[in-house]
């Protein structure tokens, strides 16, 4: 199943440690994440993890498609106070196998 890395970032004034509205959204919404993920058939491989005091978060998920991941981001409300980057990811063995389909090296 395809893997995706989600990188979330927000400005300090939107951080749940500083903003009462986003704090409420986070506290109330966090418990709904597993149920929403199950509904959309998304499996968390790592995270969600909060990266210290950097105003960033990260998660690694498996999902049928990037559109499913985007739907999760929308329905969870994460997009309301985070900028979210979604990148496809491969294991190292998968990436090595994929290189066989790349044209010969340029250098």
Describe the residue ranges of each PLM region.
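An amphipathic, aromatic/His-enriched active-site/gating alpha helix that lines ligand/cofactor pockets
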Residues: 63-94
């Amino acid at each position: 199943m395809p893997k995706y890395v989600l990188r979330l970032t927000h400005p300090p004034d939107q951080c749940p440690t500083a903003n009462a509205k986003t704090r409420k959204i986070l506290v109330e919404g966090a418990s709904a994440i597993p149920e929403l993920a199950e509904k959309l058939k998304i499996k968390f491989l790592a995270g969600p993890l909060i990266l210290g005091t950097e105003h960033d978060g990260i998660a690694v998920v498996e999902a049928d498609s990037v559109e499913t991941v985007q739907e999760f981001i929308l329905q969870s409300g994460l997009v309301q106070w985070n900028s979210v980057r979604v990148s496809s990811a491969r294991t190292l063995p998968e990436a090595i196998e994929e290189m066989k389909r790349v044209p010969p090296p340029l250098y």
